[in-house]
UniProtKB/Swiss-Prot annotation:
Present with 377 molecules/cell in log phase SD medium. This is Anaphase-promoting complex subunit 11. Keywords: Cell cycle, Cell division, Ligase, Metal-binding, Mitosis, Ubl conjugation pathway, Zinc, Zinc-finger. Its EC number is 6.3.2.-. GO terms for cellular component: anaphase-promoting complex; nucleus. It comes from Saccharomyces cerevisiae (strain ATCC 204508 / S288c). A zinc finger (RING-type) spans 52-95.
């Protein structure tokens, strides 16, 4: 018996490797237990493995970024969000200061673009005279002298200094 192959059609699938955010997730590396609702961009609600509304094709042209607060977004979505006056430099999901998580290969290519957008937005707000509303990206951890514990992470929404400005 002889077999002649006329055509070959390759089929493949890919997905982003998003580092787990907790020790429990790392210990339980079972993809069956993952919640599908968590695999969407918090801004455009499109799948991470799909594209944002700005892109036509998934992959390197529509990459992800991971915030220090462990929220993930398409890079086009978060940059467009951070460039709006209402964002005030905060994560759209948890309203903490949005910063790229350091030490992740997925974020390395976006650091310079992130710094440029934040700097440009800060300069625009200074010109408009509303720079005090912009959250300082350089100091996400503040010294709390009333607390005997000392340095602590401050939730930006509940920070009294922020509310009084």
């Amino acid at each position: 018996m002889k077999v002649k192959i006329n055509e070959v059609h390759s089929v493949f699938a890919w997905s982003w490797h998003i580092p787990s955010t907790s020790d429990e997730d790392a210990a339980n590396n079972d993809p069956i237990g993952n919640d599908e609702d968590e695999d969407v961009c918090g801004i455009c609600r499109a799948s991470y493995n799909g594209t944002c509304p700005s892109c036509k094709f998934p992959g390197d042209q529509c990459p992800l970024v991971i915030g220090l607060c462990h929220h993930n977004f398409h890079d086009h979505c978060i940059y467009r969000w951070l460039d709006t006056p209402t964002s005030k430099g905060l994560c759209p999901m948890c309203r903490q200061t949005f910063q790229l998580q350091k030490g992740l290969a997925i974020n390395d290519a976006h650091v310079q673009k992130f710094v440029e957008i934040v700097s440009r937005r800060r300069e625009e707000m200074i010109e408009e005279g509303v720079a005090e509303e912009f959250v300082d990206f350089d100091e996400p951890i503040r010294q709390n002298t009333d607390n005997p514990i000392g340095r602590q992470q401050v939730d930006t929404i509940l920070d009294e200094d922020f509310l009084l400005r």
